């Protein structure tokens, strides 16, 4: 069995892995895991990843369940262009520096709107307005940190070429944009960075990867989304309760 990637393109890390593999011509089989239908909680998927999360990489009997580890593994195994995950010690350390900050600040912050506007209402849960406003303030703060600490006057987050850092960041920032919050507005430096990253990746690949999330609000308004099965409601409610 060749390389298998378990993905749901509603998921930011899934999109990052998908785009990376496609952009670099890495052969793989897509195993779609539809989160809205609760497929991530199925017994079948639990045998692949007992954490019940996507993305997952399965390479024969070898399994990885964290997106950063998956991207690094693919970079090394398929010997992709050095700029993605530089061999230079200091450049690589800077990629890891960003990814560590990303996990603590970007990840979890920019996905909240999906829960407040789509996932919560699907199961009849309303996120308190004060949490929504707090999240908006947090996004503004983190975006400023992203510009001041990482982007600065550079073309990309770690120097003058695209790295794994840019890909992971772009996919997180696309989440609120797709849900009606244009966080790039009034941020010309960040907007120019996004345009450079998307130009490098290619418009067709970006559209393919982003089509699911970009259509989510329209589908929700037309009540075209599947209602998650009752057995996943408890885990969804817990996730919503954890929104700071």
Curated annotation (Swiss-Prot):
Annotated CDD domains: GST_C_Theta, GST_N_Theta
Record-listed E.C. numbers: 2.5.1.18
Subcellular location: Cytoplasm, Cytosol; Nucleus
Keywords annotated in UniProt: Cytoplasm, Nucleus, Transferase
Function description: Conjugation of reduced glutathione to a wide number of exogenous and endogenous hydrophobic electrophiles.
Subunit architecture: Homodimer.
Single GO MF descriptor: glutathione transferase activity
Main localization category: cytoplasm
Name of the protein described by the UniProt record: Glutathione S-transferase theta-2
Stretches assigned to the GST C-terminal domain: 88-230
Tissue and organ expression note: In liver, highest expression found in central vein limiting plate hepatocytes. Also expressed in interlobular bile duct epithelial cells. In lung, expressed in club cells and ciliated cells of the bronchiolar epithelium and in type II alveolar cells of the lung parenchyma.
GST N-terminal domain location: 2-82
GO cellular component: cytosol; nucleus
Family that this chain belongs to: Belongs to the GST superfamily. Theta family.
Residues that coordinate or bind glutathione: 40-41, 53-54, 66-67, 104-107
Record flagged with keyword Cytoplasm: yes
GO biological processes: cellular response to leukemia inhibitory factor; glutathione metabolic process
Catalytic activity: RX + glutathione = an S-substituted glutathione + a halide anion + H(+)
């Amino acid at each position: 069995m060749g390389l298998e990637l378990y993905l749901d393109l509603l998921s930011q890390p899934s999109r990052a892995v998908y785009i990376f593999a496609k952009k670099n011509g890495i052969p793989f089989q897509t195993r779609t895991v539809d989160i809205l239908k609760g497929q991530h909680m199925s017994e079948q998927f639990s045998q692949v990843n007992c954490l019940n999360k996507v993305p997952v990489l399965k390479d024969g009997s070898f399994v990885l369940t964290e997106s950063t580890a998956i991207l690094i593994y693919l970079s090394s195994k398929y010997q992709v262009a050095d700029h993605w995950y530089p061999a230079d010690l200091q450049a690589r350390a800077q990629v890891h520096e960003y990814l560590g900050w990303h996990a603590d600040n970007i990840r979890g912050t920019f996905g909240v709107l999906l829960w407040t506007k789509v996932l919560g209402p699907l199961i009849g849960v309303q996120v308190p307005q004060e949490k929504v406003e707090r999240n908006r303030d947090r996004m503004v703060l983190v975006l400023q940190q992203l510009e001041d600490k990482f982007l600065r006057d550079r073309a990309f987050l770690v120097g003058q070429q695209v790295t794994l850092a840019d890909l992971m960041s772009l996919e997180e920032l696309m989440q609120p944009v797709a849900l009606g919050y244009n966080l790039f507005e009034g941020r010309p430096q960040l907007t120019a960075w996004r345009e450079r990253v998307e130009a490098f990746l290619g418009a067709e690949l970006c559209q393919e990867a982003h089509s699911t999330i970009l259509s989510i609000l329209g589908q929700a308004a037309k009540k075209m989304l599947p209602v998650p099965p009752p057995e996943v409601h408890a885990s969804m409610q817990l996730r919503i309760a954890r929104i700071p």
